[in-house]
Amino acid sequence: DWHRIGVSGRASYEKHGTSSCMKLLSCISGLNIRLAHEKKGCASVLIPWLYCGENVYHTFFFAPPGVGKTTYLRDCIRLLSKGNHLRAGKKVGVVDERSEIAACYRGIPQNDLGPRTDVLDNCPKEHGIHMLLRSMSPQIIAVDELGLPEDFAAVADCARCGVSILGTI
């Protein structure tokens, strides 16, 4: 799993042309430890509500940090990819920019995302969405932590192509 620690403190920046990037974090004042884990089946109750006939609705999870948006997203991906006795599994493409959905190790997902799921790990959402649309013929594209204008522009491109989106915001 992809465990992580958030750190707060005094930030120092270095200027690079017209932009700057953080160089150092000193005077550490806080830590937030998050233990990632799968909760298989947690999204089972949601799956019937995601369908419109055989198609999947565009679905976005909104909630405060730390309440399980990514956990529900991951389980929805697994359940939609797997299918069940009523519906065939769907081809799902995942853009996992921060390796929090699939937790890939050397390109292999360590979390169970289902048998029909393709993962682009460590790939910016905007680029990954377009790569999946062009090359993997997904029925659904899943992304975590949408927020930038270019992320939403790529999501709009998915909708225009007839591909369903699952995401967190």
Predicted feature locations:
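Conserved P-loop NTPase nucleotide-binding/switch module
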Residues: 136-169
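P-loop NTPase nucleotide-binding module
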Residues: 43-97
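Conserved nucleotide-binding/hydrolysis micro-motifs of P-loop NTPases
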Residues: 2, 11-13, 56, 98-101, ...
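A general structural motif
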Residues: 40-45, 119-127, 146
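P-loop NTPase switch/communication element
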Residues: 81-130
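Conserved catalytic network of the ASCE P-loop NTPase/AAA+ motor domain
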Residues: 52-54, 65, 82-87, 109-112, ...
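Well-ordered alpha-helical segments embedded in enzymatic catalytic cores
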Residues: 72-75, 125-131, 154
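P-loop NTP-binding catalytic core
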Residues: 1-55
